[in-house]
Regions:
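Positively charged, phosphate-engaging catalytic surfaces used for nucleic-acid and nucleotide handling
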Residues: 1-127
Length: 127
Protein backbone atom coordinates (compact mmCIF):
# COMPACT_ATOMS: atom_id res chain seq x y z
CA UNK A 1 0.00 0.00 0.00
CA UNK A 2 0.89 3.64 -0.37
CA UNK A 3 0.66 6.29 2.31
CA UNK A 4 0.41 10.01 1.63
CA UNK A 5 1.45 12.74 4.03
CA UNK A 6 0.15 16.25 3.43
CA UNK A 7 2.48 19.22 3.85
CA UNK A 8 -0.28 21.63 2.88
CA UNK A 9 -3.41 21.68 0.75
CA UNK A 10 -1.34 21.34 -2.41
CA UNK A 11 1.87 19.50 -1.41
CA UNK A 12 1.97 15.78 -0.73
CA UNK A 13 4.76 13.34 -0.06
CA UNK A 14 4.19 9.77 -1.14
CA UNK A 15 5.53 7.30 1.39
CA UNK A 16 5.95 3.61 0.72
CA UNK A 17 6.76 1.22 3.54
CA UNK A 18 10.45 0.26 3.33
CA UNK A 19 12.70 -1.91 5.48
CA UNK A 20 14.77 0.15 7.93
CA UNK A 21 18.08 -0.77 6.28
CA UNK A 22 16.81 0.79 3.03
CA UNK A 23 15.70 4.00 4.77
CA UNK A 24 18.83 4.67 6.84
CA UNK A 25 21.22 5.72 3.99
CA UNK A 26 18.45 7.79 2.39
CA UNK A 27 17.77 9.47 5.72
CA UNK A 28 21.44 10.47 6.04
CA UNK A 29 21.28 12.05 2.57
CA UNK A 30 18.18 14.02 3.57
CA UNK A 31 19.85 15.18 6.78
CA UNK A 32 22.92 16.30 4.81
CA UNK A 33 20.71 18.20 2.38
CA UNK A 34 18.97 19.93 5.31
CA UNK A 35 22.32 20.92 6.83
CA UNK A 36 23.70 22.19 3.53
CA UNK A 37 20.61 24.34 3.03
CA UNK A 38 20.37 25.71 6.57
CA UNK A 39 24.07 26.07 7.36
CA UNK A 40 25.48 27.18 4.00
CA UNK A 41 23.04 28.11 1.24
CA UNK A 42 20.37 29.97 3.21
CA UNK A 43 22.79 32.06 5.32
CA UNK A 44 24.52 33.17 2.09
CA UNK A 45 21.16 34.01 0.48
CA UNK A 46 20.05 35.75 3.68
CA UNK A 47 23.07 38.02 3.72
CA UNK A 48 22.82 38.88 0.02
CA UNK A 49 19.04 39.48 0.19
CA UNK A 50 19.11 41.41 3.45
CA UNK A 51 16.96 39.00 5.42
CA UNK A 52 16.32 40.01 9.03
CA UNK A 53 17.67 36.58 10.10
CA UNK A 54 21.05 35.49 8.73
CA UNK A 55 22.66 33.14 11.27
CA UNK A 56 22.35 29.41 10.55
CA UNK A 57 20.96 28.55 13.99
CA UNK A 58 18.28 31.26 13.63
CA UNK A 59 17.30 29.92 10.22
CA UNK A 60 17.07 26.41 11.67
CA UNK A 61 14.95 27.76 14.55
CA UNK A 62 12.54 29.38 12.10
CA UNK A 63 12.26 26.25 9.97
CA UNK A 64 11.74 23.88 12.90
CA UNK A 65 9.26 26.17 14.65
CA UNK A 66 7.32 26.55 11.38
CA UNK A 67 6.95 22.80 10.87
CA UNK A 68 5.76 22.31 14.46
CA UNK A 69 3.84 25.60 14.69
CA UNK A 70 5.37 25.81 18.15
CA UNK A 71 8.80 25.97 19.78
CA UNK A 72 10.59 22.95 18.37
CA UNK A 73 12.01 22.08 21.79
CA UNK A 74 8.47 21.41 23.05
CA UNK A 75 8.51 18.42 20.68
CA UNK A 76 12.18 17.35 20.60
CA UNK A 77 14.82 16.87 23.29
CA UNK A 78 16.81 20.09 23.54
CA UNK A 79 20.57 19.61 23.82
CA UNK A 80 20.72 15.81 23.88
CA UNK A 81 21.58 15.48 20.19
CA UNK A 82 20.92 17.67 17.15
CA UNK A 83 17.27 18.49 16.55
CA UNK A 84 17.39 17.48 12.88
CA UNK A 85 18.44 13.94 13.89
CA UNK A 86 15.37 13.64 16.11
CA UNK A 87 12.87 14.64 13.42
CA UNK A 88 10.50 12.00 12.14
CA UNK A 89 10.91 11.23 8.45
CA UNK A 90 7.78 13.27 7.71
CA UNK A 91 8.98 16.27 9.74
CA UNK A 92 12.40 16.06 8.06
CA UNK A 93 10.63 16.14 4.70
CA UNK A 94 8.62 19.17 5.78
CA UNK A 95 11.77 20.94 6.98
CA UNK A 96 13.51 20.26 3.67
CA UNK A 97 10.52 21.47 1.67
CA UNK A 98 10.35 24.72 3.64
CA UNK A 99 14.13 25.24 3.45
CA UNK A 100 14.03 24.75 -0.33
CA UNK A 101 11.20 27.26 -0.62
CA UNK A 102 13.10 29.77 1.49
CA UNK A 103 15.76 29.97 -1.21
CA UNK A 104 13.26 32.05 -3.23
CA UNK A 105 11.70 33.85 -0.25
CA UNK A 106 11.31 37.58 0.09
CA UNK A 107 12.66 39.34 3.17
CA UNK A 108 9.02 40.01 4.16
CA UNK A 109 8.22 36.29 4.29
CA UNK A 110 11.34 35.61 6.35
CA UNK A 111 10.42 38.51 8.64
CA UNK A 112 6.96 36.97 9.12
CA UNK A 113 8.35 33.47 9.80
CA UNK A 114 10.82 34.93 12.29
CA UNK A 115 8.06 36.90 14.05
CA UNK A 116 5.93 33.74 14.28
CA UNK A 117 8.86 31.78 15.67
CA UNK A 118 9.62 34.46 18.24
CA UNK A 119 5.94 34.72 19.23
CA UNK A 120 6.01 31.01 20.13
CA UNK A 121 8.73 32.02 22.62
CA UNK A 122 6.81 35.10 23.86
CA UNK A 123 9.50 37.33 22.33
CA UNK A 124 9.51 40.10 19.75
CA UNK A 125 12.05 40.73 16.97
CA UNK A 126 13.54 43.53 19.08
CA UNK A 127 14.29 41.23 22.08
Amino acid sequence: GKLYAAYSDTDYLQIRPLPFDKIKPHRRNLEQAYLELTQQQLPEIAEAAGWPVQEDHCIQRMVLDAIYQDCWYNHLAKGRWPAYQQLSNIKLGQALLLAHRLRQASPKLVEWLNACSLSFRKKTPTD
